[in-house]
Structures are given as C-alpha cells and as structure tokens.
C-alpha cells in the first residue's frame, strides 16, 4: 500500500476517533482579529519610541553604562554637553516603525490611540470570556496541566505534532501560553504603561516605586513587548503547522469544515497580507501630511486622557519622594546652549554672568514688569528634588532652586480674566520649522492653572549650584506635571495670553509646532 493513502486513512481514523466539535464564536474571532491589528500598531509605534532613546535601565538615574540592554553602539562621554539625548535618536524606515523618520511625536500619538482601542477590545473580550463560560478554555483548573504541557513541549521539540485528541480546543502547552498572555502579560503592559506619565508618577510616586522605579517599569514594558512579539510569531506559525485545516476553518468559519479548508487558507493568508499592508500604509499616510496627522491622532486620545491623566498633577514638592542620595550623577540633556550665530544677545549676557539680564513679564496683566536675577531671588526661593521625565524615555533626578511662577505673576498686578495660558519664550532657537521656514525662537505654553501649581518654578540653580548653560541658565522652567519638552531653557520672557492657538503655529509650543507633540504633555 502506498504511503499517501495510508496517511489519509490514518488521518481519517484519527478524525473519527477525535471528532472536532469545538465552536469558535463570532465574538472570539472578531476580537482576535482586532487584537492582531492593534498589536501591530502598538509594536510598530513602540519601536518608534524606543528609537528615540534606545537604552533601557533599571535605575531612574539613567547613567551611561548602567543600561541592561541598548540598541545602539554609541558610547556616551560623561562631559556635560558632549553628547545629548537628541544625538542618540535613530531614524528608522516607515516599513519598520510607525510612522518612521524620527517622528516620535506622531509615534507616541499612534501608541496612545492604539492603546485606547486595545484596552476597549480587551475589556469586551474578557467580558464575553467570563459571561459565556468560555474562560475554561484558557484558565487551568487542575495541576495535571503541568506534566501534560511538558509532554507537549517535548513533542514539539522532537518536531512531532500532538494528537488532535489533545486539543480541547488547545493542548495543555497552548492553554498555558494563552493564559499567560491574557491574564499575566496583558495586565503587565496595562499597569506599567501609566508609569510613563509624569503626571501619574508625580502625583503617585509610590506607584512607580512599586515596580522599582519608572525605568524598571519601562524595562518591564519592553520585556512585555518582546513576549507579545515572540508569542505572536510562534502562535501564527503553529496555526499553519499543527492541524492547520482545523485551525484555519475555526478562525474563519467558527467550526471545522473539511470542505472549506482551501477557502480558509486563502482568507487567512489574504487577511494577514492586507493587515501588514495596512500597517505600512499607516506610516505613509501619517508622513504625507504631518500636521493633519498630529491633529487627528492627538485629538483621538483626548477622551481617555480626560478620564485619566488629566485628573492628576505633580505633588513631588509636597510628598518629597526623592532625597539628596537619589540625585543623578549624570543627567541627560536634549539641546545645546545657544550659539553666537543663534543668539548673540544670549552670548553677551552669559559673558557677563547674566548681570545685565532682565526677565520680561507681561501680556494680559495690569502691571507688566522686568526683573533681574537678584530681584527674582529676593521675591521668593523654593528648592525641590524632582524626577525629570523625557518623552524619549529617559529620566533624571535633580535638585532645582528658583521662584514659583505663581509668586512671579503676583508681582505684575491683576491677571485679565480672559487670560488662560502662560507663554514662556527662550533665547534658544528651534531645530527646524514645520514648513521649512527659517528657525524661530523656542517657546512653550502652559495652561494658567498648571503654571500656578506648587511644583512649577523658574529655576536659577541646580544641585545647590548656579544653573549651567547646558541646563538652561539664566532661568529654566520646571513644570513637573509635564514631560521635559515643556520645560523650556534659557527663558527670556513670560507672557500671559488668551490661548496658545494665537501664537506660533498655534499648536502650543515649538515641540508641538515642529515636533508634532501635544500641548498636553501629561503622558
């Protein structure tokens, strides 16, 4: 007898003995497809964020050489200003990351949008899982699963296929894998994600410390991404290798139907091709009109942010979660001191140790005024040890000394009731402009209530020493509720305005205008 008829007869006998009567309901198939689509968006946008600071640590000080893993060969010199975090950024192809081309602002926006829908899809999936009793497919109910899973692992290791009788609907090893992904890996990603928010960490310092710190949580988030990526590759591979006719007809039609195997193959492979093409198309759609993409993507995240991070502000001054021993020996910076070509005025002031510097404070106030550094120090002084969080991923802890913006604004009379924002302008210049026009002075805008927070100061000192040029001398804004791109350096003026849409490109600051970040930097 030839081998082919024998194999066919054997398969038929097995099928008769182990009839496949499992049903994959529509809700299961739909949520799986949505999860597949969104996980690709999350991983690709996550890669874009990683490329902005391709180093991972377990300590919040982020000292060069303390990385446990890095995706760059660059060595970081310890001299102040010799190497910046911006120098570390990588420009990736849109085929790999979302959107690619070093557009971290848009990558972060995509990550936020995808996270919102992924969470919603997950809640729906778990609700159906519990409500229909399908949880027993994933949740082990006996310790017998462990030796059975070991037997399955040995079977796969010997490149053999487990019997169809072992799948109810999954074999023990696959059941453990699904249980781990759904009930351990997914919650890990959910609980570590908020630690990336300066508003959350500033309001609840204990939450970050629960994971060992913000950087430890960031590293756990990366490990979770690797777990998901590895699981997806193995999972899709096994679908096509182990009892593929059963798997594919279940995925497409909900039950095993030998007469529709070919149709199932075409549908599944075609769907994968379309989804991969869609992932790549998202990148090029985003890059085709970056301003349009910025508006649409960030607007899409506002709803969930209003319910979550927008409710929090930093209370590091009151809670004092950091002490002198936590201060970073090395603190990353993102830009360099303005050159003479960029700002001759700044260089002249710096040459005289800012003795002639005066901070202009005006706009929608009744008594505009200007102040020297000595006059500012005479008004009030506050020191705070806080953690700086950069949207690239790195952190640094330092002691900042300066005047609360609230105390400063109290010196310039009444604030117009229509004033809702505070604009801070810098001696520094933007790296580039959105439309390619000549670069303009760097600026940022804060909502008035955030500018009046206890943790918001204009700092003239760092770690009990005068502020250096690299860190923003003569004055540097510290707004601990926000990411670092709002903490403008080399501040020359403070202006009360009606709304941020009336200045610059109308997006809320230089990083928003040309870097496509959001004016709300709480996450």
Describe each region flagged by the PLM:
Residues 348-400:
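A glycine-rich, hydrophobic loop/mini-helix early in the fold
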């Amino acid at each position: 007898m030839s081998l082919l008829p024998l194999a066919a007869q054997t398969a038929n006998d097995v099928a008769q003995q182990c009839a496949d009567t499992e049903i994959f309901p529509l809700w299961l198939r739909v949520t799986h497809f949505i999860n597949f689509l969104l996980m690709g968006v999350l991983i690709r946008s996550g890669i874009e964020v990683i490329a902005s600071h391709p180093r991972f640590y377990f300590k919040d000080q982020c000292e060069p050489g303390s990385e446990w893993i890095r995706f760059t060969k660059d060595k970081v010199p310890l001299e102040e200003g010799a190497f910046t975090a911006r120098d570390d950024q990588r420009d990736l192809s849109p085929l790999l990351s979302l959107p690619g081309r070093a557009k971290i602002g848009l990558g972060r926006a995509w990550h936020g949008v995808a996270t919102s829908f992924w969470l919603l899809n997950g809640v729906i999936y778990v609700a159906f899982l519990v409500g229909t009793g399908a949880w027993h497919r994933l949740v082990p109910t006996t310790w017998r699963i462990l030796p059975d899973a070991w037997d399955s692992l040995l079977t796969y290791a010997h490149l053999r296929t487990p019997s169809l009788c072992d799948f109810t609907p999954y074999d023990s090893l696959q059941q453990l894998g699904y249980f781990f992904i759904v009930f351990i890996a997914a919650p890990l990603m959910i609980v570590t994600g908020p630690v990336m928010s300066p508003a959350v960490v500033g309001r609840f310092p204990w939450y970050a410390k629960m994971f060992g710190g913000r950087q430890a949580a960031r590293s756990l988030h990366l490990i979770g991404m690797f777990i998901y990526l590895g699981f997806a590759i193995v999972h899709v591979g096994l679908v096509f290798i182990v009892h593929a006719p059963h798997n594919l007809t279940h995925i497409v039609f909900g039950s095993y139907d030998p007469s529709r195997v070919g149709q199932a193959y075409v549908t599944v492979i075609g769907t994968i091709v379309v989804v991969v093409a869609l992932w790549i198309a998202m990148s090029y759609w985003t890059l085709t009109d970056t301003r349009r993409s910025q508006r649409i993507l960030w607007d899409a995240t506002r709803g969930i942010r209003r319910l979550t991070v927008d409710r929090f502000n930093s209370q590091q001054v009151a809670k004092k979660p950091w002490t002198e021993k936590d201060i970073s020996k090395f603190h990353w910076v993102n830009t360099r001191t303005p050159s003479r070509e960029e700002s001759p005025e700044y260089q002249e002031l710096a040459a005289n140790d800012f003795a002639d510097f005066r901070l202009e404070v005006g706009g929608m106030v009744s008594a505009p005024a200007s102040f020297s550094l000595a006059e500012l120090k005479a008004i009030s002084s506050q020191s705070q040890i806080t953690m700086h969080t950069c949207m690239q991923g790195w952190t640094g802890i330092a002691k900042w000394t300066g005047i609360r913006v609230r105390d400063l604004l109290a010196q310039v009379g009444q604030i117009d009731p229509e004033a809702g924002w505070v604009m801070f302008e810098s001696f520094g210049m933007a790296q580039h402009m959105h439309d390619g026009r000549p670069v303009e002075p760097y600026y940022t805008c804060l909502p008035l209530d955030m500018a009046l927070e206890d943790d918001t100061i204009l700092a003239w000192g760092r770690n009990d020493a005068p502020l250096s040029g690299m860190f923003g001398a003569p004055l540097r804004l510290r707004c601990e509720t926000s990411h670092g791109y709002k903490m403008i350096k080399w501040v020359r003026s403070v202006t009360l305005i009606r709304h941020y849409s009336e200045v610059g490109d109308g997006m809320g600051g230089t990083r928003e205008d040309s870097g496509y970040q959001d004016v709300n930097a709480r996450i």
